[in-house]
Amino acid sequence: MKTHHANLALALMLGLSSSATAVAADAPQAVATKAAAPNVKPVAADAHGVIPDGAPGMCARSPACRATAIPADAFVRTADLGRLTDADRDALAALGVKLDIDLRTADEEAQSPDLLARDDRFDYQRISLMGTEKMDLQKMMTSFPDSLGEAYVQWLGHSQPQFKQVFQRIAAQQDGAVLFHCTAGKDRTGIIAGLLLDLAGVPKAEIVHNYAISAHYLEGQPKDSDERADHGAGQAEPGDRPQDGGHGRYRAGQHGAVLAALHSQYGGAEGYLKSIGVSEQEIQQLKVRLGQAG
């Protein structure tokens, strides 16, 4: 995996219009075409790479952050992959994606099947970060506190077995890029990305920007999780609740509060992973993938 230095640290899929096409890494128009979400200041490097025409999230390879060298082809983050074209799948294969981790519930997957799951070029695994039964999700949502930051901290505690499984599966992947996605491409993927970035020693401000910029790119996207939550389907994520403002209104300070709580309660991502049963060897393997060891 090649190592590059720049702004965001991970190869990401961030939400853009499904009709978008490829964007050059240094093209300022890529960030000037959409109004930024509150508290977000996009830079040209935030839009970079190949954009699947059929996906509600773009396939964007974010260059590595300024302070920490992370392989630019280590991870890909995206939204729902139920509308990928053949060309989209070819583009992901060309990016080196080998593993697709679907963070959605069984109901979400049934409503919009992941099209990489039936492509032999990709290994597919679904690990729901929101529980296994609809009633569990509804109970979890009603118990969330008013603060989105507090909700994320509770989420880290509530879904420890699922987080453990996700990071163990990533650690076990020896080659290629690891793609992880949910429905909206923001909350579940965002918290996984945040933990990876923190494990790599990325500065807090850049982790917050990494999360908040997704709201910028999600502007104008169908609020699938919001709509399903309104109809009682039980698939809402914390940031999709009406009191949290939905997509595009995320307050960056809230994610900063999550990071502060992560360090206060667990000593950071590494401490959290150890507390949920991820082994020292697996953490070392994660660091190798992140370009921080080996």
Swiss-Prot record:
Signal peptide feature range: 1-24
EC supergroup of this enzyme: hydrolase
E.C. number: 3.1.3.48
InterPro entries, per the entry: Prot-tyrosine_phosphatase-like, Tyr/Ser_Pase_IphP-type, Tyr_Pase_AS, Tyr_Pase_dom
Catalyzed chemical reaction(s): O-phospho-L-tyrosyl-[protein] + H2O = L-tyrosyl-[protein] + phosphate
GO molecular function, a single term: protein tyrosine phosphatase activity
Catalytic residue positions: 182 (phosphocysteine intermediate)
Pfam (any one): Y_phosphatase3
PROSITE patterns with a match to the protein in the record: TYR_PHOSPHATASE_1 (PS00383), TYR_PHOSPHATASE_2 (PS50056)
Domain of life (superkingdom): Bacteria
SUPFAM superfamilies: (Phosphotyrosine protein) phosphatases II (SSF52799)
Composition skew (Basic and acidic residues), residue ranges: 221-231, 238-247
Alphabetized UniProt keyword annotations: Hydrolase, Protein phosphatase, Signal
Quaternary organization: Monomer.
UniProt family annotation: Belongs to the protein-tyrosine phosphatase family.
Annotated protein name in UniProt: Tyrosine-protein phosphatase
UniProt source species: Nostoc commune
